[in-house]
């Protein structure tokens, strides 16, 4: 299984604000991995089993993970990326987890082939290789969300306190 994360650059979040609730995503620039450029629905699972579906109109849609990651690192908006793609950038502070108390459904990786009968030996070796090596690599790329998510939560609290101080002043 592959965990998806909502991520953005600290630069973008400092400028546009850190969403505290999934509904606030509609007020942000989003970049999406989708065939449908017009609409996108992100389903988030929150504390105590809450489920929220947020309809968005992404500014950019495509299937190129490295391009989307590069764009969000440069401050273009918020996107959903597989943890395996963005974990290192989150660890080193280039990206920040958005809505750290909420999660996205996990994706599942499948190897699909027509039939075992007539399966080329090279294909069988490749499938066996994936079955052996992919799960440990996925596990190694998992974020210890304790650190990264706690930093994101602290920034959300700090921005909320800053907004309260401005309102009170």
Walk through the language-model features, giving the residues of each.
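Alpha-helix N-cap/loop-to-helix initiation residues
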Residues: 14, 37-38, 105, 119
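Secondary-structure junction motif
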Residues: 29-48
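Short secondary-structure boundary/capping segments
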Residues: 21-23, 32-34, 51-52, 87, ...
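Flexible hinge/capping segments at coil-to-helix
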Residues: 1-3, 7-31
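C-terminal effector-binding regulatory domain of bacterial HTH transcription factors
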Residues: 83-92, 102-169
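Short loop segments at secondary-structure junctions
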Residues: 9-12, 36, 47-48, 115-117
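Hydrophobic hinge/microswitch elements
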Residues: 53-97, 104-105, 124-127
């Amino acid at each position: 299984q592959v965990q998806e994360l909502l991520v953005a650059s600290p630069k973008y979040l400092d400028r546009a604000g850190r969403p505290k609730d999934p509904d606030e995503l509609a007020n942000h620039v989003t970049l999406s991995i989708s065939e449908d450029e017009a609409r996108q629905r992100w389903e988030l699972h929150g504390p105590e089993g809450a489920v929220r579906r947020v309809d968005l109109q992404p500014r950019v849609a495509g299937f190129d993970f490295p391009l989307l990651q590069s764009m969000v690192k440069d401050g273009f908006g918020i996107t959903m990326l597989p943890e395996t793609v963005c974990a290192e950038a989150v660890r080193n502070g280039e990206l920040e987890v958005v809505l750290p108390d909420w999660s996205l459904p996990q994706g599942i990786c499948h190897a699909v082939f027509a039939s075992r009968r007539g399966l080329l030996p090279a294909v069988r070796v490749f499938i066996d290789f994936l079955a052996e090596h992919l799960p440990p690599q996925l596990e190694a790329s998992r974020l210890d969300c304790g650190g990264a998510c706690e930093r994101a939560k602290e920034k959300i609290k700090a921005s909320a306190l800053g907004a309260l101080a401005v309102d009170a002043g």
